[in-house]
Amino acid sequence: MENYKFSTLEYKRPDLETRRAKLAQWKAAVGQAESYSALRSLIFEIDRESCELFTQYSIAHIRHTLDTRDEFYEAEINYLQDTLPTLSGDEVALSEAIAASPFRADIEREFGKQYFVSMDLQKKLFCEANIPLRQQESRLTNEYQKIMATAEIAFDGKTLNLYGVQKYFEHPDRTVRAAAVKAYSKFYEDNEPRLEEIWSELIRIRNQMGKNLGYENYIPVGYLEQGRTDYGEKEVASFREQVRTFLVPLCQKLYDAQAKRLGIDHVMWYDEKMVFPDGNAEPASDDAFMVRTAQKMYHEISPETGEFIDFMIDHELMDLQNKPGKASTGYMTSLPSLKAPFVFSCFNHTIFDMQVLTHELGHAFAGYMAMRSQPIADFYSESTDIAEIHSMSMEQFAYPYAEWFFGNQADKFRFAHLQEALTFVPFGVAVDEFQHICYAHPEMTPKERTYQWHLLEEKYMPWRRYEDDAFMERGGYWYHKLHIYLYPFYYINYTLTTMGAMEFKKKYAENRDAAWQDYLKLCKTGGSRSYLETLRYANLANPFEPGSVERACGYAEEILLKQIAEQAK
């Protein structure tokens, strides 16, 4: 299928009873396989049909998020999220049959030990009693997404969605910024009663899943779902502590310098995005220009990225414009039967647009390479703690081309972007610790949980000031972070992978070719190795080792503090 466009792809609801019957047939055939060759053929047949099933799911999911008001795709995604979990037992039974095969050693020799590690995770996570809980979970997360996607905020004489109002967070007029964040805050305050209920229900449901699997709560399940096989809560807690002791004081310095630059006593919440007194760097407001320029940039970076971006544009595998009803998120997903990534976002004509064209396309490039390098779909996607290295490193690789997007404001872009790469990390670890607290203490009331967020802001973001916004001051900021609702325990990945991205930044400055080859290795390996094995393979450091945060971020710290000193002259 060479000449397709995403818009013309046919969606066909998967026949799940046929799939169930196929799973039983494959299980029997695996047990009857008399040679590794016969078993190998079955593995590839299973892989092909699984790719097709996931591709149809992806088409439905993408089209649902493109317009959450579309009743057909809303019904389809609800149907699939209700019914697909009922196949889990059959999937696990098939995996167990493959794992018990007398040809297991042959499988491991060809596909590596990670093949069975992934199967073992699938087995550990399966519990028949959790199927209806998964269905309830999906309905609740879909409701959260719909609340966010259908937001209508009256501001500046317009009706804006959440992405639209965030553009004003960078307005040069401080009173406009303050009014914009107040309007944004009010949306969450108005919706707080239902958002509290959804979160309480998700905690209850997920903790019950954990208990059904033999755990005290959901936390160990969340780690397994993220594919974490070679580190756990202890290592993550030690990483958060490194962030608190090294990065939090550095970020305080950065915000103190920003206050001086802006001519104010303290950076308020509505000032945090305003890095320069005469305005932040803004890219072109022409979406088509941004995409054309990104295409030119990717051709400059490498032959591989040039081929990739042409593929994405030729097949219309990006939807980037902000539209009514569109989900307020950004993501990359895949259409594995086509070996095609898909990128979704909402441009708002700020430096965020540049991040989309690098971050989400960094994910997509990694998927594109893995789908062409790995033999089976199990390895097309890497563990989540590796995935964000691809995206965040691509953001750094784009720095030499900033003039193409920002003209004489390129230096502003580079400074603001690098500063945000570091100042984001304390927020990211706060999100992670918040989730640990909530699942470990389900007895907390909604107001007590929100107060815990307030305490975490004091711990990790002591510079944060909300002025007269009582809702945010008592801890309301966390409601906006959809990962807390939709992707439990994912968010720490952004902070761990920032360390890898900062390493790549330094390597790219010192030896571009060597850094690019390591990056290609990282992308091509997909999910064929564990987290720590993948880091070693790509010549990256272990972020849990003492002093790793300071070593990874030291180069960026040096750049920022040097520029701050020059700005102060």
Residue ranges and their predicted role:
Residues F116, D120, R228, L357, ...:
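C-terminal, non-catalytic "cap/extension" segments appended to globular domains
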Residues F342-C346, Q374-T384, F413-Q419, Y439, ...:
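Short beta-alpha connecting loops at secondary-structure transitions
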Residues M1-A281, T293, K569:
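A well-structured
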Residues K323-T350, G367-Y368:
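Active-site scaffold of zinc-dependent metalloenzymes
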Residues R244-F246, A370, S381-Q409, H417-Q419, ...:
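Post-HExxH zinc-binding segment in Zn-dependent metallohydrolases
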Residues K253, D265-S328:
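Gly/Pro-rich turn-and-neighbor structural signature
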Residues E282-D287, L338-T358:
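Short pre-active-site segment immediately N-terminal to the catalytic Zn-binding motif
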Residues G362-I376, F397:
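Catalytic Zn2+-binding segment of zinc metalloproteases
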